[in-house]
């Protein structure tokens, strides 16, 4: 059994080794055959590649020959052009060299000419120096001879000549200024007269001159006795209720009213008239009741007057306090001219002039009406009425240009707008028209005295006369001390001094009169 198994094992091992040997043999044989076949294929491929390379080289040679055949004629032509261009360049270079040589020659010739001119110039400069020295010596000799002949030094002569030339220049300038002023004034005055004549013709506002009443007459002796009680309680009651002083003189049949506030004076006057009309038992309680009723009625009238004036001038947006103050001007007078009607006149005149000049008409009327509003409160506030009024309307919303025109209408500040100058002109027209204003003898004498003192304070003035109701100042001067040019300058200085120191309505004409009187006596004796 074991032998059989061993025999089987040996057979299996021997069969396996034989199989492995056969497998290895056939594998080696297959690899050899594959290598031989691959080598054959590689050889064939190399032969094909070599053949193709040969064909490609032949094709390239053919293409090169074909291209050379086409390009060769063009290359030959290009070579011919290059030769032509080279010849042209050579010719141009030769010409340029010739031009350069010619310019060098010209430059050399010019340099030679310059040297010759420099030498000539040096000679002329030397000769000029000699001439200057000769001229200097001649001038010195001339100055010396003139000095000896005139008897003064050169500096003194120069000073005299300078002064003469300055004086002549001043005279010419003064003459030119005079001619220019005459032409300007002639044109300006004619245009102003034309506009004013049109405005005055178009303005026909009704006006009745009136005067403020400062006294109330007693109806009879009985009323006087009732009012003037021994203790003076009635008079004191009127003074306390109305704010004005009551003046009752023995033997006078009237009651005087004194006070700085025109509205309070009017209230006092109305209260007294009402008390005297009642003819009842007059006592302090009755007086206070009458005064209160009259105060309400007066303020109602003031408001109505302010509203009426604003409505008449077609002004809108006016503050209620402004209208109230305008109404209070109904009882304010300046040089006997009622300021309520004066403001209305100025408003209309300013509007008409604005229409002629193409300026805002409504604003001109507004400024004209408001220009003297400060007079309604100048008794309670310090300062000029123009400044007071301007501050008042500025605090109540008026435009800056309106405020400026009100403030500048008496030159409290320099006017700089058209409306400011319009108000100045309209104010002058309203105040200077005949019958508008009157002055007392005391104020007139004071005005005359001030004008004469101002005119006589200037050197050369011999006398002064005030004419035309204080609207003309005629100044007489010494003809030996003041010439024509100085007379013209003197008139301007006097006018400027009057504007600066005096405050009067309207304009004042200054006339300077220079008189030259020449006399000669005959020497021949009569037979």
From Swiss-Prot:
HD domain boundaries: 339-432
Gene Ontology cellular-component annotations: plasma membrane
Broad class of the protein's primary localization: membrane
Keywords (A to Z) from UniProt: Cell membrane, Endonuclease, Hydrolase, Membrane, Nuclease, RNA-binding, Transmembrane, Transmembrane helix
Stated role: Endoribonuclease that initiates mRNA decay.
Family statement: Belongs to the RNase Y family.
Protein name per its UniProtKB record: Ribonuclease Y 2
Gene coding for it: rny2
